[in-house]
Regions:
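Conserved donor-binding loop and adjoining core beta-sheet/short helix segment
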Residues: 1-45, 137-159
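Conserved acetyl-CoA-binding loop-helix of GNAT-fold acetyltransferases
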Residues: 36-48, 159-175, 191-196
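Short amphipathic alpha-helix that is part of the acyltransferase structural core
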Residues: 1, 84-116
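Conserved active-site alpha-helix within GNAT-family acetyltransferase domains
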Residues: 61-72, 164, 186-204
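Acyl-donor-binding surface of acyltransferase catalytic domains
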Residues: 31-88, 205-210
Length: 212
């Protein structure tokens, strides 16, 4: 199922993320511009329901504050030099290991708010970009991640209690002085981990509300 980066009606312009519907039944709506947001939101809602959405979340307009709050997306940053070093090893995902990486990712992310399911197409894109990694220590798999430039886009522990090591390994693989990441405000355990490593909250990227 394809997304609609520009979903336009006579009542407004927005974005619809529908690719999660086959896996989780979830759709996301972002209101970009509307002079009649209530009417436009209802159009987005009905469209998402027609294509099979069972849970719908929306962001982008103050009208949404009348709905139940779901989560915020928080940006955090840290100085790379402030993150503890680790002797764990980092290995890029290959065409032989992408299947296992994807399996771990989908298992660990299935209960994380606003995390996307990794489809075959998304896994292929990851492999082409070359920014997916396994983190090992003493021959044991600790976790996986996605990192490039100055960003960490995914952290998932495989072995319980190894989140700090996974984050440290990914951070020190980056060629930058600062590292940034984004996390759902409801993922309190991850936020505590990042703060313990020296990350600070720098921005609230978006707020999401449950509209269906």
């Amino acid at each position: 199922m394809r997304d609609f980066p520009m979903f336009t009606t006579e009542n407004g312009v927005g974005s619809l993320v529908l690719k999660e519907i086959p896996y989780s039944g979830i759709a996301y709506v972002t209101i970009r511009d509307s002079s009649v947001p209530k009417e436009f939101l209802n159009e987005c809602l009905e469209f998402c329901k027609v294509v099979g959405a069972q849970h719908i979340y929306a962001s982008g307009h103050e009208i949404l504050t009348s709905y139940p709050f779901h989560t915020s997306v928080i940006r955090m940053s840290a100085a790379v030099d402030a993150i503890p070093q680790t002797d764990a090893s980092i290995f890029p995902v290959t065409d032989k290991t992408i299947g296992r990486w994807r399996e771990i990712y989908n298992d660990r992310m299935k209960c994380v708010d606003n995390a996307a399911f990794m489809s075959d197409a998304a896994a292929s894109d990851l492999l082409k970009r070359g920014d997916g990694y396994f983190i090992h220590k003493d021959g044991e798999l600790l976790g996986i991640g996605i990192a490039s430039d100055d960003r960490i886009d995914c952290v998932a522990s495989y072995k319980p209690g190894c989140g700090r090591t996974v984050v440290s390994a990914l951070t020190h693989a980056l060629m930058s002085e600062q590292v940034i990441l984004e996390v759902a405000s409801t993922n309190e355990r991850a936020i505590r981990l990042y703060e313990s490593l020296g990350f600070i909250k720098t921005a609230e990227i978006s707020k999401w509300y449950k509209i269906f």
